[in-house]
Swiss-Prot record:
It is found in: Cell membrane; Secreted, Extracellular space, Extracellular matrix. This is Matrix metalloproteinase-25. PANTHER family: MATRIX METALLOPROTEINASE (PTHR10201), MATRIX METALLOPROTEINASE-25 (PTHR10201:SF142). Residues 1-21 form the signal peptide. The gene is MMP25. Residues 295-304 have a biased composition (Pro residues). It comes from Homo sapiens. Its EC number is 3.4.24.-. A motif (Cysteine switch) lies at residues 88-95. Zn(2+) binds at C90, H233, H237, H243. Residues 278-313, 490-526 are annotated as: Disordered.
């Protein structure tokens, strides 16, 4: 225990961001240590190794993880890194470790073990207990997932019935929690599945899926986890491939969403290169495709509230969203009882929206609109706001009941237009109309001296639909069909703002040429001029007019008072 506390203290001191950015919380650092150790970036902590752990090695571990995930290589537990660590992913470690990854040039990784035969057998022994997918659909999806690898190599796969004296090479199970191997599942979200590399051990090649996930295929609303995409990834492990950092690789450790029609799916070049390094190229003869087609479950009629009419599916390209939030690296767009999800890659999970109450389990049925949402930095909880109340979720599960906005420092009966956590100072901002409040999550209390005028964010539109911060640290204000970008560390919008939201965020056609959205008025000093200047300086490091550098220490003490 003492060793762990010393390691946490060392990480807090060495991996903290510069003074202008918020320091990582102890909980985030603990998550980072556990995550980096679990997935192979740090050795397991014990006395002999902890004494040899250097600041450079700790930073290297985080940088390699960031490189693997396609993040800026800061070497710090910044918000984007923490959000990525909280994303659903494969259970297996990113096996090569720091030294191998630093030297590595190719993206794919090989486990060092292969099957010594070219014809492999497989069987699904147990099926998901509470899935919309039939057992036949699950078997067909597994067949197509294996075919994706067989088409690019000299491997063939045969499904076998119940064992007659010998188990198949690849035995597939849907299991929960501890299930007699070294990789227990953790319930909904988190780790999704794992598979074992080839070998002579009875468990070699076996593939396990977390039965507490909501497994789907062909989902029209983006709900659940696509079984085919995860199966293709795990079978890559079962054939001897490790994780890849290539952007388009199915072997990336993080879940990337559906990959399309199984009959048309093809591996990326990086995945083909890794597979053919192990088994050679596919023969010229056509691959024997499965004769069955995977069928999505029949569409279920949407459940309508008892005393209200059904809501038509809105057009995402019209903008005018009720709320927009960055939740664990994905951007959520809320509109009425619907929402869309944008992956970190910039791709929509689905062009069709998901239903609010099917996803956020426990949200009261009478809540038909989410006015604001954000992920709380200190513990990863997700807060949804509607009217003068908010609800707290752990992943998709509601914790407790409705809570009043007065807990966050707002007057009784007040509502919010936007809520966001600003990484430059770790504070939470609550916007209503032309003013905003600020809340200190670490101290669990509202900051004094608020509300303040929103014009201090120079160029921001009044009454925004919402405000969110990207994984890169830029702040975005949204209103109508446009957005205003504030570069990292700045509270002054870019000169070309506003920009159309649809083509840049939601895969919509560019708007026809016409009048631009009106630009908000330029910020003007409020009655307390000094207070206004402090706001501008402490957030962005920029001043309305040149000020001698020697005066800066006298005028501002840092971002904490923003």
């Amino acid at each position: 225990m003492r060793l762990r506390l010393r390691l946490l203290a060392l990480l807090l001191l060495l991996l903290a961001p510069p003074a202008r950015a918020p320091k990582p919380s102890a909980q985030d650092v603990s998550l980072g240590v556990d995550w980096l150790t679990r997935y192979g970036y740090l050795p397991p902590p014990h006395p002999a190794q902890a004494q040899l752990q250097s600041p450079e090695k700790l930073r290297d571990a985080i940088k390699v993880m960031q490189r693997f995930a396609g993040l800026p290589e800061t070497g710090r537990m910044d918000p984007g890194t923490v959000a990525t660590m909280r994303k659903p992913r494969c259970s297996l470690p990113d096996v090569l470790g720091v030294a191998g990854l630093v030297r590595r040039r190719r993206r794919y990784a090989l486990s060092g073990s292969v099957w010594k035969k070219r014809t492999l057998t497989w069987r699904v022994r147990s099926f998901p207990q509470s899935s919309q997918l039939s057992q036949e659909t699950v078997r067909v999806l597994m067949s197509y997932a294996l075919m994706a690898w067989g088409m690019e190599s000299g491997l063939t796969f045969h499904e076998v019935d119940s064992p007659q004296g010998q188990e198949p090479d690849i035995l597939i199970d849907f299991a929960r929690a501890f299930h007699q191997d070294s990789y227990p599942f953790d319930g909904l979200g988190g780790t999704l599945a794992h598979a074992f590399f080839p070998g002579e051990h009875p468990i070699s090649g076996d593939t396990h899926f977390d039965d507490e996930e909501t497994w789907t295929f062909g989902s029209k609303d983006g709900e659940g986890t696509d079984l085919f995409a995860v199966a293709v990834h795990e079978f890559g492990h079962a054939l001897g491939l490790g994780h890849s950092s290539a952007p388009n690789s199915i072997m990336r450790p993080f879940y990337q969403g559906p990959v399309g029609d199984p009959d048309k799916y093809r591996l990326s070049q990086d995945d083909r290169d890794g597979l053919q390094q192990l088994y050679g190229k596919a023969p010229q003869t056509p691959y024997d495709k499965p004769t069955r087609k995977p069928l999505a479950p029949p569409p279920q009629p949407p459940a309508s509230p008892t005393h209200s009419p059904s809501f038509p599916i809105p057009d995402r390209c019209e903008g005018n969203f009720d709320a927009i939030a960055n939740i664990r690296g994905e951007t959520f767009f809320f509109k009425g009882p619907w929402f869309w999800r944008l992956q970190p890659s910039g791709q929509l999970v689905s062009p069709r929206p998901a239903r609010l109450h099917r996803f956020w389990e426990g949200l009261p049925a009478q809540v038909r609109v989410v006015q604001a949402a954000y992920a709380r930095h200190r513990d990863g909880r997700i807060l949804l706001f509607s009217g003068p109340q908010f609800w707290v979720f752990q992943d998709r599960q509601l914790e407790g009941g409705a809570r009043p906005l007065t807990e966050l420092g707002l007057p009784p009966g007040e509502e919010v237009d936007a809520v966001f956590s600003w990484p430059q100072n770790g504070k939470t901002y609550l916007v209503r109309g032309r003013q905003y409040w600020r809340y200190d999550e670490a101290a669990a209390r509202p900051d004094p001296g608020y509300p303040r005028d929103l014009s201090l964010w120079e160029g921001a539109p009044p009454s925004p639909d919402d405000v969110t911060v990207s994984n890169a640290g830029d702040t975005y204000f949204f209103k109508g069909a446009h957005y205003w970008r504030f570069p990292k560390n700045s509270i002054k919008t870019e000169p070309d703002a506003p920009q159309p939201m649809g083509p840049n965020w939601l895969d919509c056609p560019a708007p026809s040429s016409g009048p631009r959205a009106p630009r908000p008025p330029k910020a003007t000093p409020v009655s307390e001029t000094c207070d206004c200047q402090c706001e501008l300086n402490q957030a962005a490091g920029r001043w309305p007019a040149p000020i001698p550098l020697l005066l800066l220490p006298l005028l501002v003490g840092g971002v904490a008072s923003r």
